[in-house]
């Protein structure tokens, strides 16, 4: 059996009749303009993919909006009212479990005054 390739053999009259049909005109147009064969299907697949994936992107942005929504005025006021004062030292000792010990030390040292010690004459900085 002889293999002639993918192009079917047509006689002269058959080819002219085929060229007048819609399929023949389309095939002739494809040979002249490669965009219809490569570019158009590519663009259509991109657009179809975008439309198909639109549901997933909508879900993504809804999750984003939930996470970063703006706080209403009433919620903001309730957050401010429930706020406790922040003290770095007390929070540090509280987290270490040493807050009770620290409060005892502070209460025992309340009568302590910080006094600057005078330097020797030779230790004084000279400008």
From Swiss-Prot:
Q: Which InterPro entries match?
A: Cyt_c_Oxase_assmbl_COX16 (IPR020164)
Tell me the leader sequence span: none
Localization recorded for this chain is: Mitochondrion inner membrane
Chief location category: mitochondrion
Bilayer-crossing regions: 34-53
The domain of life for this entry's organism is Eukaryota
A Pfam family: COX16
GO terms, biological process: mitochondrial cytochrome c oxidase assembly
- One GO CC annotation: mitochondrial inner membrane
The keyword Nucleus belongs to this UniProt entry's keyword annotation: no
Q: How does it sit in the membrane?
A: Single-pass membrane protein
* Keywords annotated in UniProt: Membrane, Mitochondrion, Mitochondrion inner membrane, Transit peptide, Transmembrane, Transmembrane helix
Give the function comment from the record: Required for the assembly of the mitochondrial respiratory chain complex IV (CIV), also known as cytochrome c oxidase. May participate in merging the COX1 and COX2 assembly lines.
The record's similarity note reads: Belongs to the COX16 family.
- The name under which this protein is listed is Cytochrome c oxidase assembly protein COX16, mitochondrial
Native source organism of the sequence: Debaryomyces hansenii (strain ATCC 36239 / CBS 767 / BCRC 21394 / JCM 1990 / NBRC 0083 / IGC 2968)
The opening ranks of the lineage are: Eukaryota, Fungi, Dikarya, Ascomycota, Saccharomycotina
Gene name of the record: COX16
